[in-house]
Amino acid sequence: MGFFITFEGIEASGKTTQINLLYDYLKSIGKNVIKTREPGGTKIGQKIREILLSKWDEKFPYIAELLLYESDRNIHIQSIVKPSLDAGYIVLSDRYIDSTTAYQHYARGIDYEIVSYLNTLATDGLKPNLTFLIDIPVEISLKRLSESKDRIESEDIEFHKKLREGFLKIAENEKGRFVVIDGTMDIMEIHKIIVDSLKQRSII
Protein backbone atom coordinates (compact mmCIF):
# COMPACT_ATOMS: atom_id res chain seq x y z
CA MET A 1 0.00 0.00 0.00
CA GLY A 2 1.26 3.48 -0.86
CA PHE A 3 0.96 6.73 1.07
CA PHE A 4 -1.65 9.40 0.38
CA ILE A 5 -0.66 13.05 0.96
CA THR A 6 -3.00 15.97 0.30
CA PHE A 7 -2.36 19.70 0.16
CA GLU A 8 -5.05 22.17 1.19
CA GLY A 9 -5.42 25.92 1.50
CA ILE A 10 -7.41 28.93 0.39
CA GLU A 11 -6.90 30.44 -3.07
CA ALA A 12 -3.30 31.40 -3.98
CA SER A 13 -1.88 29.87 -0.79
CA GLY A 14 1.10 28.36 -2.61
CA LYS A 15 0.11 24.71 -2.20
CA THR A 16 0.56 23.87 -5.90
CA THR A 17 4.13 25.22 -5.80
CA GLN A 18 4.83 23.03 -2.77
CA ILE A 19 3.38 19.93 -4.44
CA ASN A 20 5.65 20.48 -7.43
CA LEU A 21 8.72 20.95 -5.22
CA LEU A 22 7.92 17.83 -3.19
CA TYR A 23 7.21 15.79 -6.30
CA ASP A 24 10.59 16.73 -7.80
CA TYR A 25 12.36 15.98 -4.51
CA LEU A 26 10.74 12.56 -4.10
CA LYS A 27 11.59 11.65 -7.70
CA SER A 28 15.20 12.73 -7.11
CA ILE A 29 15.57 10.28 -4.21
CA GLY A 30 14.06 7.42 -6.20
CA LYS A 31 10.54 7.29 -4.77
CA ASN A 32 7.56 6.10 -6.81
CA VAL A 33 5.34 9.18 -6.74
CA ILE A 34 2.53 10.77 -8.72
CA LYS A 35 0.93 14.21 -8.42
CA THR A 36 -2.68 14.90 -9.21
CA ARG A 37 -5.42 17.41 -8.41
CA GLU A 38 -9.10 17.93 -7.67
CA PRO A 39 -11.05 18.87 -9.60
CA GLY A 40 -9.50 17.88 -12.91
CA GLY A 41 -7.23 14.92 -12.21
CA THR A 42 -8.71 12.87 -15.07
CA LYS A 43 -9.86 13.66 -18.63
CA ILE A 44 -13.50 13.64 -17.54
CA GLY A 45 -12.50 15.62 -14.46
CA GLN A 46 -10.92 18.32 -16.63
CA LYS A 47 -14.31 18.88 -18.27
CA ILE A 48 -16.01 19.01 -14.85
CA ARG A 49 -13.34 21.49 -13.68
CA GLU A 50 -14.11 23.76 -16.64
CA ILE A 51 -17.80 23.77 -15.70
CA LEU A 52 -17.08 24.43 -12.02
CA LEU A 53 -14.64 27.30 -12.53
CA SER A 54 -16.29 29.05 -15.48
CA LYS A 55 -18.58 32.03 -14.94
CA TRP A 56 -22.19 31.43 -16.05
CA ASP A 57 -25.03 33.83 -16.79
CA GLU A 58 -27.52 31.53 -15.07
CA LYS A 59 -27.99 30.31 -11.49
CA PHE A 60 -25.51 27.65 -10.33
CA PRO A 61 -27.12 26.02 -7.25
CA TYR A 62 -24.76 25.08 -4.43
CA ILE A 63 -26.02 21.48 -4.34
CA ALA A 64 -25.35 21.10 -8.08
CA GLU A 65 -21.85 22.46 -7.48
CA LEU A 66 -21.28 19.97 -4.64
CA LEU A 67 -22.48 17.03 -6.73
CA LEU A 68 -20.14 17.97 -9.56
CA TYR A 69 -17.17 18.09 -7.18
CA GLU A 70 -18.11 14.67 -5.81
CA SER A 71 -18.57 13.22 -9.30
CA ASP A 72 -15.09 14.42 -10.22
CA ARG A 73 -13.74 12.93 -6.99
CA ASN A 74 -15.29 9.50 -7.50
CA ILE A 75 -13.80 9.22 -10.98
CA HIS A 76 -10.46 10.49 -9.67
CA ILE A 77 -10.35 7.97 -6.81
CA GLN A 78 -11.28 5.00 -8.99
CA SER A 79 -9.04 5.95 -11.93
CA ILE A 80 -5.95 7.49 -10.32
CA VAL A 81 -5.68 7.47 -6.55
CA LYS A 82 -6.63 3.92 -5.52
CA PRO A 83 -4.74 2.16 -8.35
CA SER A 84 -1.62 4.22 -7.55
CA LEU A 85 -1.85 3.50 -3.82
CA ASP A 86 -2.39 -0.20 -4.52
CA ALA A 87 0.77 -0.14 -6.65
CA GLY A 88 2.73 1.30 -3.72
CA TYR A 89 3.07 4.89 -4.93
CA ILE A 90 3.16 8.05 -2.87
CA VAL A 91 0.19 10.06 -4.14
CA LEU A 92 0.27 13.87 -3.87
CA SER A 93 -3.11 15.51 -4.41
CA ASP A 94 -3.76 19.23 -4.82
CA ARG A 95 -7.05 19.39 -2.84
CA TYR A 96 -9.29 16.56 -1.64
CA ILE A 97 -12.24 16.08 0.75
CA ASP A 98 -11.18 18.84 3.16
CA SER A 99 -11.60 21.39 0.37
CA THR A 100 -15.18 20.26 -0.13
CA THR A 101 -15.90 20.50 3.59
CA ALA A 102 -14.35 23.97 3.74
CA TYR A 103 -15.89 25.35 0.55
CA GLN A 104 -19.29 23.68 0.51
CA HIS A 105 -20.01 23.46 4.26
CA TYR A 106 -18.16 26.31 5.94
CA ALA A 107 -18.25 28.85 3.08
CA ARG A 108 -21.44 27.86 1.21
CA GLY A 109 -23.41 26.75 4.27
CA ILE A 110 -24.51 23.30 3.08
CA ASP A 111 -25.33 20.99 6.00
CA TYR A 112 -22.21 19.20 7.30
CA GLU A 113 -23.90 15.78 7.33
CA ILE A 114 -24.74 16.07 3.62
CA VAL A 115 -21.19 17.08 2.69
CA SER A 116 -19.65 14.40 4.91
CA TYR A 117 -21.93 11.66 3.52
CA LEU A 118 -21.16 12.58 -0.09
CA ASN A 119 -17.42 12.79 0.63
CA THR A 120 -17.54 9.27 2.06
CA LEU A 121 -19.68 7.97 -0.80
CA ALA A 122 -17.40 9.44 -3.48
CA THR A 123 -14.20 8.14 -1.88
CA ASP A 124 -15.42 4.83 -0.44
CA GLY A 125 -14.13 6.19 2.87
CA LEU A 126 -10.55 6.77 1.71
CA LYS A 127 -8.87 9.44 3.84
CA PRO A 128 -5.39 10.92 3.40
CA ASN A 129 -2.55 9.61 5.53
CA LEU A 130 -1.20 13.15 5.87
CA THR A 131 -2.48 16.63 4.96
CA PHE A 132 -0.49 19.84 4.66
CA LEU A 133 -2.56 23.00 5.15
CA ILE A 134 -0.73 26.00 3.71
CA ASP A 135 -2.34 28.84 5.64
CA ILE A 136 -2.25 32.49 4.57
CA PRO A 137 -4.34 35.53 5.56
CA VAL A 138 -7.27 36.28 3.25
CA GLU A 139 -5.85 39.71 2.39
CA ILE A 140 -2.67 38.11 1.01
CA SER A 141 -4.71 35.54 -0.90
CA LEU A 142 -6.76 38.22 -2.64
CA LYS A 143 -3.65 40.29 -3.38
CA ARG A 144 -1.95 37.29 -5.03
CA LEU A 145 -4.89 36.43 -7.27
CA SER A 146 -4.64 37.54 -10.89
CA GLU A 147 -7.03 39.98 -12.51
CA SER A 148 -8.66 37.17 -14.52
CA LYS A 149 -10.24 35.38 -11.53
CA ASP A 150 -12.32 32.24 -12.00
CA ARG A 151 -15.83 31.81 -10.55
CA ILE A 152 -14.63 30.67 -7.12
CA GLU A 153 -11.79 33.18 -6.83
CA SER A 154 -14.29 35.96 -7.62
CA GLU A 155 -16.34 35.34 -4.46
CA ASP A 156 -16.43 38.20 -1.94
CA ILE A 157 -14.05 38.60 0.99
CA GLU A 158 -16.54 37.13 3.49
CA PHE A 159 -16.61 33.88 1.51
CA HIS A 160 -12.81 33.67 1.63
CA LYS A 161 -12.76 34.44 5.37
CA LYS A 162 -15.26 31.64 6.06
CA LEU A 163 -13.14 29.37 3.89
CA ARG A 164 -9.96 30.02 5.84
CA GLU A 165 -11.78 29.60 9.17
CA GLY A 166 -13.21 26.33 7.88
CA PHE A 167 -9.82 24.91 6.94
CA LEU A 168 -8.37 25.85 10.34
CA LYS A 169 -11.32 24.22 12.17
CA ILE A 170 -10.92 21.01 10.15
CA ALA A 171 -7.19 20.94 10.96
CA GLU A 172 -7.90 21.57 14.66
CA ASN A 173 -10.34 18.65 14.73
CA GLU A 174 -7.87 16.25 13.05
CA LYS A 175 -4.51 17.27 14.49
CA GLY A 176 -3.03 13.82 13.95
CA ARG A 177 -3.44 14.07 10.18
CA PHE A 178 -2.70 17.76 9.61
CA VAL A 179 0.46 19.82 9.47
CA VAL A 180 -0.46 23.51 9.37
CA ILE A 181 2.23 25.71 7.80
CA ASP A 182 2.50 29.50 7.64
CA GLY A 183 2.26 30.14 3.90
CA THR A 184 3.77 33.63 4.19
CA MET A 185 7.22 32.12 4.82
CA ASP A 186 9.88 31.69 2.14
CA ILE A 187 8.99 29.01 -0.43
CA MET A 188 12.06 26.88 0.28
CA GLU A 189 11.57 27.22 4.03
CA ILE A 190 8.06 25.77 3.63
CA HIS A 191 9.45 22.99 1.44
CA LYS A 192 11.99 22.09 4.15
CA ILE A 193 9.22 21.86 6.78
CA ILE A 194 7.29 19.50 4.49
CA VAL A 195 10.30 17.28 3.81
CA ASP A 196 11.22 17.22 7.51
CA SER A 197 7.63 16.23 8.36
CA LEU A 198 7.90 13.24 6.02
CA LYS A 199 11.26 12.23 7.51
CA GLN A 200 9.89 12.48 11.07
CA ARG A 201 7.11 10.08 10.08
CA SER A 202 9.58 7.70 8.39
CA ILE A 203 7.82 8.14 5.04
CA ILE A 204 11.16 8.93 3.39
Swiss-Prot record:
Reaction(s) the record says it catalyses: dTMP + ATP = dTDP + ADP
Record-listed E.C. numbers: 2.7.4.9
PROSITE patterns xrefs: THYMIDYLATE_KINASE
Membrane-crossing residue ranges in chain numbering: none
Entries under InterPro entries matching the protein: P-loop_NTPase (IPR027417), Thymidylate_kin-like_dom (IPR039430), Thymidylate_kin_CS (IPR018095), Thymidylate_kinase (IPR018094)
GO molecular function: ATP binding; dTMP kinase activity
Pfam families hit by this protein: Thymidylate_kin
A GO biological-process term: dUDP biosynthetic process
Keyword S-adenosyl-L-methionine included in the entry's annotation: no
Top-level EC class as recorded in UniProt: transferase
Family matches, as SUPFAM superfamilies: P-loop containing nucleoside triphosphate hydrolases (SSF52540)
Keywords linked to the UniProt accession: ATP-binding, Kinase, Nucleotide biosynthesis, Nucleotide-binding, Transferase
Binding site for ATP: G9, I10, E11, A12, S13, G14, K15, T16
Record flagged with keyword Cell division: no
Annotated Gene Ontology cellular component terms: cytosol
Signal peptide range in chain numbering: none
Function: Phosphorylation of dTMP to form dTDP in both de novo and salvage pathways of dTTP synthesis.
PANTHER family for this protein: THYMIDYLATE KINASE, UMP-CMP KINASE 2, MITOCHONDRIAL
Family indicated by similarity: Belongs to the thymidylate kinase family.
Protein name, per record: Thymidylate kinase
Species per Swiss-Prot/TrEMBL record: Sulfurihydrogenibium sp. (strain YO3AOP1)
Gene: tmk
